[in-house]
């Protein structure tokens, strides 16, 4: 085999206004999934201003075997609500999951989280439902959903609307039927080396399950000793222990 180099390929392609009225000037916060049929599906929010009620979600697809992304189209847009922000995940049986924040009105401070599923590579979707009944903090999904070896689905969400204050994990142990938030009602931790708390250090967290079963997460903000913060949990996100990572911190316009 030979090395293959290509790109970058633009996936944000502006559609005609009559085909996609929600499309606007500011496009941000993508989620990406490899569909069972080999297609790549990307979604992101589009808006005039990030706090605006006009903010909605659009999608583009790179069909398997093709080298160009399709023009953007409507994906999710609750009328007169700020839809901030999105995550995609595919399970072991090929079912796609879409998680999204749903504001009570404008801004991303007070959100509920919706979930819907697709069994045909994202062509059609189930009716959306709230996975937890109340609006509030801890409901802006981050694009690093995973299923643990124990079978739990974990959806990370920003814990705060600001640039520092951590991330939390919504947990389902029954394949998405019911959900809990281990950090609900808990104070924002002291994100210093050696401390523990109910949240991940840093917003927009990315995380994995290690070979020994622990969860390891990195975040943006809440830097520790001048480094990107690292959080480790040995109880599926119930509590986290903090330390500085080997990596330099990241800031605005950067994500894990």
Predicted regions and their residues:
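Asp-box/BNR beta-propeller blade signature and adjacent active/binding-site loops
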Residues: 1-256
């Amino acid at each position: 085999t030979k090395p293959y180099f290509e790109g970058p390929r633009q996936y944000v392609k502006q559609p005609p206004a009559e085909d996609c009225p929600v499309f606007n000037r500011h496009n941000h916060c993508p989620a990406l999934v490899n569909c069972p049929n080999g297609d790549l599906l990307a979604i992101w929010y589009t808006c005039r201003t990030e706090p605006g009620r006009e903010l909605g979600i659009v999608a583009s697809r790179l069909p398997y075997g093709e080298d160009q992304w399709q023009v953007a189209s409507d994906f999710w847009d609750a009328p007169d609500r700020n839809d901030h922000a999105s995550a995609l995940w595919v399970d072991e049986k090929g079912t796609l999951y879409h998680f999204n924040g749903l504001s009570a009105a404008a801004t991303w401070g007070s959100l509920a989280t919706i979930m819907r599923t697709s069994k045909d590579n994202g062509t059609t979707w189930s009716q959306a439902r709230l996975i937890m009944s109340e609006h509030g903090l801890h409901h802006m999904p981050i694009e690093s959903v995973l299923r643990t070896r124990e079978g739990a689905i974990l959806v990370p969400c920003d814990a705060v609307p600001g640039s520092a204050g951590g991330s939390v994990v919504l947990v389902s142990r029954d394949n998405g039927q019911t959900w809990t938030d281990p950090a609900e009602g808990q104070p924002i931790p002291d994100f210093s080396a050696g401390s523990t708390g109910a949240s991940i250090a840093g917003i927009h967290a990315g995380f994995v399950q290690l070979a020994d079963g622990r969860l390891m997460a990195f975040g943006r903000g809440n830097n520790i000793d001048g480094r990107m913060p690292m959080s480790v949990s040995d109880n599926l996100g119930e509590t986290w222990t903090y330390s500085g990572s080997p990596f330099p911190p990241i800031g605005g316009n950067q994500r894990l």
